[in-house]
Amino acid sequence: MPSLNQLIRHGREEKRRTDRTRALDQCPQKQGVCPRVSTRTPKKPNSAPRKIAKVRLSNRHDIFAHIPGEGHNLQEHSMVLIRGGRVKDSPGVKSHCIRGVKDLLGIPDRRRGRSKYGAEKPKSI
């Protein structure tokens, strides 16, 4: 334990907080190109394959991003917009693709939670 004199001379060193989404460079979103689209098996006890895309961001970072919702149209060289947010059962996947922006289409015929999946408002009868 330091003495009072040592604290006056040097002070205490602040702990540095680690950045969870370092690849985003403090930005809310970043765009990138998909060199690869694949599936990955999650951690136990879950088992359904998770759709992920490897994305090369505009700042040259390579990350894995989750593709939310049922079905997608992503291929190699597709442009996507990325936001933060990890997938709890997929190690190393710390971001999400945003649906309905750039080359990633929204989900058609989605009624609930439309804003999260880029779905258009349904036509009322």
Curated annotation (Swiss-Prot):
- Provide a GO biological process annotation: translation
Asked if Acetylation is a keyword of the record, the answer is: no
Q: Name the domain of life this protein comes from.
A: Eukaryota
Cite the CDD domains for this sequence.
Ribosomal_S12
Q: Which UniProt keywords apply?
A: Mitochondrion, Ribonucleoprotein, Ribosomal protein
Stretches with biased composition (Basic and acidic residues): 10-23
Question: Which segments carry the region annotation Disordered?
Answer: 1-50
User: What does the UniProt record say this protein does?
Assistant: Protein S12 is involved in the translation initiation step.
Q: What is this protein called?
A: Small ribosomal subunit protein uS12m
Give the originating organism.
Petunia hybrida
